[in-house]
């Protein structure tokens, strides 16, 4: 009886969201109004290894099927990476590190040569500093990987919202 009421409650909640115009941001890019625009974004090369990882992750997210699409937009990103020692032992050696990555990005129309969106994203990851050099390399690389994923999610969300709002405005919806 309780399970039936719970199921009925969730069903009514889902139907009420449909009536208010709410749409899931990542439901299905293939049917979304911003799909063609998302696939038409070219990610400019980003220097350093962390930049290469971010560029590849963004390319895979913007065009998951890898279809050849005429490029109408370019996404330029500049990264600033800061590594800090947080915890310091009595001998003066760091025991905990923090990696801060700032991504200044802008989305530009290639044909009109105009900037459509210019924002900053920030990722903050921490890692252990160990006595073994190999372990340090692995933990710091893992922090870079986590930072790239955090930046990718944030940049994708912002670009997706931009294109969805633009498509809604073109269709005359609020």
List where the protein language model places each region.
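N-terminal export leaders
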Residues: 4-8
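Bacterial N-terminal signal peptides
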Residues: 10-18
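Bacterial Sec signal peptide processing site at the extreme N-terminus
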Residues: 18-36
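Post-signal-peptide N-terminal segment of Sec-exported extracytoplasmic proteins
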Residues: 39-72
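Short beta-strands and strand-coil junctions in structured, solvent-facing domains, enriched
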Residues: 64-65, 84-86, 158, 162-165
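Surface-exposed short loop/turn segments
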Residues: 65-72, 76-120, 125-142, 146
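C-terminal/domain-edge helix-coil "capping" segments
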Residues: 138-174
């Amino acid at each position: 009886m309780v399970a039936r009421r719970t199921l009925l409650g969730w069903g009514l909640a889902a139907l009420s969201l449909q009536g208010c115009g709410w749409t899931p941001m990542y439901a299905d890019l293939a049917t979304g109004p911003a799909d063609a625009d998302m696939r038409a974004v070219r990610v400019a090369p980003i220097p350093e290894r962390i930049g290469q990882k971010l560029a590849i992750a963004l390319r895979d997210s913007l065009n998951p099927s890898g279809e050849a699409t005429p490029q109408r937009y370019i996404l330029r990103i500049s990264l600033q990476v800061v590594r800090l020692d947080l915890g310091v032992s009595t001998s003066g050696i760091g025991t905990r590190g923090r990696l801060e990555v700032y991504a200044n990005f802008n989305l530009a129309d290639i044909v009109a040569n105009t900037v459509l969106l210019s924002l900053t994203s920030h990722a903050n990851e921490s890692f252990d500093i160990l006595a073994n050099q190999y372990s340090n390399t692995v933990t710091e690389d893992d922090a870079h990987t986590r930072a790239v994923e955090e930046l990718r999610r944030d940049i994708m969300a912002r670009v997706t919202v931009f294109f969805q709002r633009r498509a809604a405005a073109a269709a005359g919806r609020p």
